[in-house]
Every structure is written in structure tokens, then in C-alpha cells.
Curated annotation (Swiss-Prot):
Protein name, as recorded: Large ribosomal subunit protein bL21
HAMAP family, per the entry: Ribosomal_bL21
Xref: InterPro entries: bL21-like, bL21-like_sf, Ribosomal_bL21, Ribosomal_bL21_CS
Lineage: Bacteria, Pseudomonadati, Pseudomonadota, Betaproteobacteria, Burkholderiales
Gene name in the database record: rplU
Similarity comment: family membership: Belongs to the bacterial ribosomal protein bL21 family.
Length: 103
């Protein structure tokens, strides 16, 4: 069984037992969270698509860790004007262990 969930402005296809990295969630490590924004639920050949959400469907997940992604380097330059700007960014994430999918 799998589900398509929405969290942090992004959509993820998840199945029971998977680990995924999502945008940072304000929850402690080891805490169990319930994601109720389920866009679709599938089981083999059967697919249930919500309009926009599947009513009554939830996905439970456990917070495994918090961290930062690799650094993304930004470099801006104007040719012949002696202008260079360097900047870096590390996006924070939360790693989730997907538990039960209830439709």
C-alpha cells in the first residue's frame, strides 16, 4: 500500500517502512506525527484519488532525525564591472520513518 502526501509545500509518494526527508517539522526526535493531507492512496491496481484530499485517510510517521542538506553555493557576477557575490545555503530537513497508512 502506498500514499501520496503533502507536507512542507511538496508532495511525496510513501509506503510503509520507508524513510523520507521532508522540510523541517517542529517535532522532537522519536515523536510520532500524523499527516492528514493525503492526496491519493493506492493498493495494487486500485487507486483512490482525493479531490483534493482523500477523506479520512491518514499517514503516521515517526521523527528519526533533524539535519541540514549539503550546501548549495550561489555565485553572482557582472562581467567587466568587478562585481562578484558569493553566498551559500543549507536547507534544514526532518527525516521521517513512515508507519501505518490508513485509508
Amino acid at each position: 500500500m502506498y500514499a501520496v502526501i503533502k507536507t512542507g509545500g511538496k508532495q511525496y509518494r510513501v509506503a510503509s517502512g520507508e524513510k523520507i526527508k521532508v522540510e523541517q517539522i517542529a517535532a522532537d526526535v522519536g515523536q510520532e506525527i500524523v499527516i492528514d493531507q493525503v492526496l491519493a492512496v493506492g493498493n495494487g491496481a486500485e487507486l483512490k484519488v482525493g479531490t483534493p484530499l482523500v477523506s479520512g485517510a491518514t499517514v503516521t510517521a515517526t521523527v528519526v532525525a533533524h539535519g541540514k542538506h549539503d550546501k548549495v553555493r550561489i555565485f553572482k557576477m557582472r562581467r567587466r564591472k568587478h562585481y562578484q557575490k558569493r553566498q551559500g545555503h543549507r536547507q534544514q530537513f526532518t527525516e521521517l520513518q513512515i508507519g501505518a497508512i490508513a485509508a
